[in-house]
From Swiss-Prot:
GO biological process, one term: amino acid transport
Keyword Transmembrane helix: yes
Membrane topology of the entry: Multi-pass membrane protein
Pfam families from the UniProt entry: AA_permease_2
InterPro entries, per the entry: AA/rel_permease1, AminoAcid_Transporter
GO cellular component: membrane; plasma membrane
This protein's encoding gene: SLC7A10
Protein name, per record: Asc-type amino acid transporter 1
Transmembrane segments: 40-60, 72-92, 113-133, 268-288, 310-330, 362-382, 388-408, 424-444, 448-468
Organism: Homo sapiens (Human)
Main location: membrane
Amino acid sequence: MAGHTQQPSGRGNPRPAPSPSPVPGTVPGASERVALKKEIGLLSACTIIIGNIIGSGIFISPKGVLEHSGSVGLALFVWVLGGGVTALGSLCYAELGVAIPKSGGDYAYVTEIFGGLAGFLLLWSAVLIMYPTSLAVISMTFSNYVLQPVFPNCIPPTTASRVLSMACLMLLTWVNSSSVRWATRIQDMFTGGKLLALSLIIGVGLLQIFQGHFEELRPSNAFAFWMTPSVGHLALAFLQGSFAFSGWNFLNYVTEEMVDARKNLPRAIFISIPLVTFVYTFTNIAYFTAMSPQELLSSNAVAVTFGEKLLGYFSWVMPVSVALSTFGGINGYLFTYSRLCFSGAREGHLPSLLAMIHVRHCTPIPALLVCCGATAVIMLVGDTYTLINYVSFINYLCYGVTILGLLLLRWRRPALHRPIKVNLLIPVAYLVFWAFLLVFSFISEPMVCGVGVIIILTGVPIFFLGVFWRSKPKCVHRLTESMTHWGQELCFVVYPQDAPEEEENGPCPPSLLPATDKPSKPQ
């Protein structure tokens, strides 16, 4: 094949191209490796989980959960149940994360256990709809809350919201492209900010309770249903709530960038999930100390309405706090979304350019640019609550398949070293609830669930054409090589080199790009 650019193998890391040619700005003969750096400690690991979970969901989902629950009491039950199910899933992911210590999360585990097609379908749905939709929803929530004080009596103009959302997205794409350390510092800082914002809501809510303002929480009122509850509606309420908990598995996407992942991955999960469940439950309790169910359902910005009713002159604090919270959520989603694209390209399931990192910053710039572009497209179309239903259904489908893989791995490879091995009842209990949720979601919203399945299945022909079919015409190979060379020169990126042993912290040294000469013309 013409040219020297190496295509990633179907499994494992791509090998560096032989005899690379020096390019301007690099140091010929440098012996150091270009690789992803291990800069994520326990604190940053916790903030990645908390920062990704606590984004826009707690400010959007309460309305959807209450609408489908039919009562305050049942809505609160859904939030507690959501935290419990998330805890079960996170325990299973902790076992998978230390047994298969690869970045890529669900995608890496499904590919390892079920093979390339299953892994590609999960990757396809995640890259095409799950991540860009979640990022679009969080970005639009950010802009709506920032603009709320400017348009206090109406919904902010759609054009203004989209422009501000895009500006925020591009800013954070630049930050993540420039430095892993900058990205994690932003995550640490804004996670602390969002916890302070929710602590303010919870604190004001507790003050309301101590003053006796909890009429909606009294049992006689809390379980006064304004519609006949059904299992199908309860399943939809849980799907809405699950959007607020999405992100609990994101730390598994950056395992290779963690310091001592075998210890810090499970520790971060055990610290973060109970904390988030506590915060979510008491935030919703606080909402109901200030608003009736009807007021909450009619509110376009729940936290803003809460602030207007209880904070008076300081009500401006709430939209600012929510904006800071969602800003951190955008950063966290970008960070993990780009690592998923990076892992997929490294396995040969996405264009090889996405498996490359900048020679100095050691960041996956091509993957970040793809993430930004895909989110921008999704941002231009779609209703928020409909998008949440699509994403929640596909998310839960992928979670269940991954945890089913845990049981299959136990059976196939019983001798595999597992520093963490959860009780068998935990994955079984999760899968029982998972099956229940999906069945009743199909019954209640067949269109939404059907579209979700179709989105996943559209990846089948793409897999066979793009991945499985190896003997493509030479013109296709020349085109892809040419585009890869062009992308390398534009982004100044190189394949990361395999680590012979655990990499120490430190600056990423410059290295050589794989040959940037153009592919030779066929003879």
